[in-house]
Amino acid sequence: MGAQLCFEANAKAPREALRFHAEAKGAQVRLDTRGCIAHRRTTFHDGIVFSQRPVRLGERVALRVLREESGWCGGLRVGFTRLDPACVSVPSLPPFLCPDLEEQSPTWAAVLPEGCALTGDLVRFWVDRRGCLFAKVNAGCRLLLREGVPVGAPLWAVMDVYGTTKAIELLDPTASRLPTPMPWDLSNKAVPEPKATPGEECAICFYHAANTRLVPCGHTYFCRYCAWRVFSDTAKCPVCRWQIEAVAPAQGPPALRVEEGS
């Protein structure tokens, strides 16, 4: 498929946070500036993405499902590959991780069970020293997705933003606290966010309209959904790193954080 194995890759890669590889991605994938969010623009395929470095045995790859899209069958696929994404010929990437990339290269992946990749879900997956691919969704039980992953050479994480899964975000599993599933998801479903016109997209999801202001810095590059997510997770503006004290419509009074128990 035009890709090659790069076995000289250092299996003991620096312990930098995982990001998506900036170049090796499906034709429909758009990444944010940090390389942490992958959004599939159209169709239900061509959503393959890779980690930017090899993943150690037992290392958890943590991600969150940011958005779903109805009308398709099937969703997120996850796994590992011996393909160094730096050596992948992007035009030759197939539209599907399962089974296309598996059949064309040393790649081992699986489909998450139905109902295990919903908007707001936290997904962790890893391979152990016996070559077993596991996943865990939120606080659920460990799931054995498949066996027989060879572990004698460097392995990169590979994901497919497929079907009903529209956007995912890589998280840092070593952080002191992983974010909980987003409590504002139901309210967002009740009041759908408007789709953006070209040039007015949210800087995080690249889909909804940038209609929300962060207080006090005043940056307005985000939709309501993503602004509240950032407020809950880090409370720091992604643009200027100022502390966020409130979230407001682009025009209107600020909405303050709701404290637990209030």
Curated annotation (Swiss-Prot):
EC primary class: transferase
Recorded metabolic or biological pathway in which this protein acts: Protein modification; protein ubiquitination
Keyword annotations from UniProtKB, A to Z: Cytoplasm, Host-virus interaction, Immunity, Innate immunity, Metal-binding, Transferase, Ubl conjugation pathway, Zinc, Zinc-finger
Domain of life, source organism: Eukaryota
Subunit structure: (Microbial infection) Interacts with hepatitis C virus protein E1; this interaction prevents E1 interaction with E2 and subsequently inhibits viral infection.
PANTHER family cross-referenced by the UniProt entry: NEURALIZED, NEURALIZED-LIKE PROTEIN 2
Protein name: E3 ubiquitin-protein ligase NEURL3
UniProt source species: Homo sapiens
